[in-house]
Curated annotation (Swiss-Prot):
Matching InterPro entries: G_ENGB_dom, GTP-bd, GTP-bd_ribosome_bio_YsxC, P-loop_NTPase
Protein name (record): Probable GTP-binding protein EngB
Keywords in alphabetical order: Cell cycle, Cell division, GTP-binding, Magnesium, Metal-binding, Nucleotide-binding, Septation
N-terminal signal peptide: none
Family: Belongs to the TRAFAC class TrmE-Era-EngA-EngB-Septin-like GTPase superfamily. EngB GTPase family.
Pfam families tied to this protein: MMR_HSR1
Amino acid sequence: MNITSASFVASYTSLHALPEAVLPEIVFAGRSNVGKSSLLNSLTGLKGLAKTSAKPGKTRQINYFLINELFYFVDLPGYGYAAVSQSEKAAWGQLLANYIERRDAISLVVVLVDSRHPFMENDVAMLEFLEFHGRPYGIVMTKSDKLNQSEKSKCQRVAKTYAAKAKFVVNYSSFSGAGKALLLSHIDHSIISQ
């Protein structure tokens, strides 16, 4: 798959405001500061498409990006960010849960896991939630450029242990683009097979 066009559509804080569910949605989920925005920019080749920040908690809404005029990339707020109020954390959690439970257009959930700190409690909870709701998902091990080959192989094995039902596990580096072609191939397959 080649991405030839990508544009920001809108940010949403309510399920009722989301676009009509007519195009497939590829959803990106993960802990705060795991690299979701960097991955989206890397996949599309557009550095400023998704706003990045070294400060966790930058994404606070559900962000929609129209890709090739055919499907959406959906950037969810990061989970596990401790520096927000309990009420804000609960609101984000409810928004994410409702979206994943109810949104018919979801083709695939791409769960980003920091390869340097793989499968923390929040990551495992997300995978269990997706499995409970029968959502197809794949795992992207981010920041893999910071690992040597032995550590990358270990991450792959750990991922398969925690997520036996994952459609794929990809080591990815937004810095070098390693894993990009493989991830785009998996995304393409999920859209075609929907």
